[in-house]
Amino acid sequence: MQPYQRDFIRFAIDRGVLRFGEFTLKSGRTSPYFFNAGLFNTGSALAQLGRCYAAAIVDSKIPFDVLFGPAYKGIPLAAATAVALAEQHQLDVPWCFNRKEAKDHGEGGSLVGAPLAGDVLIIDDVITAGTAIREVMQIINAQQAKAAGVLIALNREERGNGELSAIQEVERDFGIPVVSIVSLTQVLEFLADDPQLKQHLPAVEAYRAQYGI
């Protein structure tokens, strides 16, 4: 595990973004942990989150021309990541996002920011069913651009209804890598090393044994 990954897990726990207990997911599964990226909701938290995404991009070595943040949650993530790449890594990359509703006045259209062209790295918080990414792929294709990959905060490494996870389905269907700041494997590693949090390890391991990929 890289230092930025350990820092991210500690940061997510401290912010209440990553919690342990008993949670009913939309899928109906009862999960021993819950991840809510919406709680990275202050200026300093967003700045630190952007630094984590930027570190993951550099670590991934995925070549790309532009960052894309899907509306709505991806917009601040792409912005914060672009800032962190410039300030921490001296990489001044273009970024853009889409509107949910196209405008017919002013700058018009459904895209805002840099042109959506070349190799596009998509930034989002999680991939649950893959529906949002499929919509993004249509936007990218409509601009004759090409998806370079997807970067998310947490990979739950969890099966959907079939044998594959939603992330594996995206990788299979579009032939692009999906990388994450951290995965459940690293969360388990973190729990095992932390005396206060170790109590949650058996429940998370049991959940993984049942639903993991």
Curated annotation (Swiss-Prot):
UniProt keyword Magnesium present? yes
Q: Which InterPro entries match?
A: OPRT, Or_phspho_trans_dom, PRibTrfase_dom, PRTase-like
Query: For binding 5-phospho-alpha-D-ribose 1-diphosphate, which residues are annotated in this chain's numbering?
Result: 26, 72-73, 99-100, 103, 105, 124-132
The reaction(s) annotated as catalysed by this protein in its Swiss-Prot or TrEMBL entry are: orotidine 5'-phosphate + diphosphate = orotate + 5-phospho-alpha-D-ribose 1-diphosphate
- GO biological process entries: 'de novo' pyrimidine nucleobase biosynthetic process; 'de novo' UMP biosynthetic process; pyrimidine ribonucleoside biosynthetic process
Q: Which cofactor does it need?
A: Mg(2+)
For molecular function, the Gene Ontology terms on record are:
magnesium ion binding; orotate phosphoribosyltransferase activity
**Which UniProt keywords are present, listed alphabetically?**
Glycosyltransferase, Magnesium, Pyrimidine biosynthesis, Transferase
Q: What residue range is the signal peptide?
A: none
Locate the residues binding orotate. 34-35, 128, 156
EC number from the UniProt entry: 2.4.2.10
What is an example of a Pfam family matching this protein? Pribosyltran
GO CC annotation: cytoplasm
Fetch the SUPFAM superfamilies from UniProt.
PRTase-like
Q: In which pathway does it act?
A: Pyrimidine metabolism; UMP biosynthesis via de novo pathway; UMP from orotate: step 1/2
| SUBUNIT field | Homodimer.
Q: Family membership, please give it.
A: Belongs to the purine/pyrimidine phosphoribosyltransferase family. PyrE subfamily.
| Purpose of the protein | Catalyzes the transfer of a ribosyl phosphate group from 5-phosphoribose 1-diphosphate to orotate, leading to the formation of orotidine monophosphate (OMP).
Protein name as it appears in the record: Orotate phosphoribosyltransferase
